[in-house]
Amino acid sequence: MDLTKQFFKYVSQNIFGLLGTSCYILADTYFIAQVAGTDGVTLLNLCLPIYNFIFAIGSMIALGSATRYAIAKAQNDARGQRYFSNAILCAVLASIPWMLAGAFVPGALLRLMGGDAGIVTLGIPYARIFLLFAPFFMCNYIVSAFVRNDGDPSLAMVATLSGSLFNVVFDYVFMFPLGLGLAGAALATAVSPIISIAICSRHFLKKENTLQFVRQMPSARLLAQSCQLGISGFVGELSSGVTTTVFNFLLLGLAGNVGVAAYGVVANFALVATAIFNGVAQGAQPLVSRCYGQNDHAGARKLLLLGSGTVLVLAAVLYAAVFGLTDTLVSWFNSENSVQMAQYAHTGMRMYFVGYFFAGFNIMAAGYLSAVNRPVEASVTSICRGMVAIVTCSLVLSAVFGMPGVWAAFPASELLTALLTLFLLRRKESGKA
């Protein structure tokens, strides 16, 4: 199949899959807003960074290990099988602290994220349940990434969408007919990755399957090799958590719980937007890694250009939709009809989403750098985007401009990162893919 056709096949299927993942959090927020109003939206926004931290670990292990596997497979190196087994084992070990936190200190974790007494009391059942299921969130990321890299992106997409559909349907069933409230929302979210893993497991029964689970002890060396290439995925997910945490504390000081609830609306739609651009980067990754493994540097560069053009078009479509539907989108999560919350969220949506004109390119470029075994540049880009630039811009701009400065921090930080990323790409363009 032509490389361009392969690109759009992998990317489109991966976008749909990741959209499903983000939409189940969107569904959680919608149903929780109906049950608990702005306090419920505030609670979920305080929990979002915890989700991000769990997904960040899973993403780093999954994408890094799957990239190592894809490169080894392209070079006919049988040792690539060990990356799959090691990824599963390390993810289970990495999830243990989250499970312990869910079992014993969910309230302390919510207080650490900025929750007051009322929010903590409301959120303990929700946080406890989803933290206890942390291994399934991480392993779902891993199984999906490896199935995609083993030539079955369609099954990975179907599995992710099926898990997300289960979450949306059972959010409603558990919360309303069964009356389980926020605990029901957490239970539906927690079970959805199990559904996805079960469907992805069909790949192992196919004759085209080349993945095998090798009996071995967890290897710190293999994990370190994988994490070098997975750091962009880690920081990409973690950046959402860092951004949400910093913004939450700034907005609590500027506008209280109503400000955090308004940001909750923005953050939930931002998850959907980020999923679209992650879909482009992660969809292109197996193809870029294959080109790199076969020394097809021209093919790898072509995929970078295709990806960059795709994210720019998607950013324009996304912003047009957000700008035209701002009031409608905000109203979905404003069951109490709070005028102040609606005003904050309206301004926030229109300012914040300008940043995706730059964020899409940054996500694509970081994924490309990892896929062609340039972990240092990928790490620099990702850390600038996810840590340094966003924290600096949010602190400085909020101090000068108040709430508008908080909303402007995301576009400003993504612009600065895009300039750095362009420099890194051009600096070694003649020497590497």
Predicted regions and their residues:
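Hydrophobic transmembrane alpha-helices of multi-pass small-molecule transporters
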Residues: 53-56, 167-171, 197-201, 271-275, ...
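Short alpha-helical transmembrane segments in multi-pass integral membrane proteins
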Residues: 1-15, 69-135, 177-231, 288-355, ...
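Membrane-helix interface/capping residues of multi-pass secondary transporters
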Residues: 29, 38-41, 153, 182, ...
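Small-residue-rich hydrophobic transmembrane alpha-helices
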Residues: 41-96, 100, 137-156, 262-326, ...
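Structural signal for membrane-spanning alpha-helices in multi-pass inner-membrane proteins
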Residues: 29, 102, 145, 171, ...
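Transmembrane helix-bundle signature of multi-pass secondary active exporters and lipid flippases
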Residues: 14-63, 67, 130-137, 224-290, ...
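Helix-loop interface residues and adjacent transmembrane-helix termini in multi-pass membrane transporters
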Residues: 26, 35-38, 72, 149-150, ...
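Short runs within selected transmembrane alpha-helices of multi-pass transporters and secretion channels
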Residues: 62, 129-148, 156-167, 185-198, ...
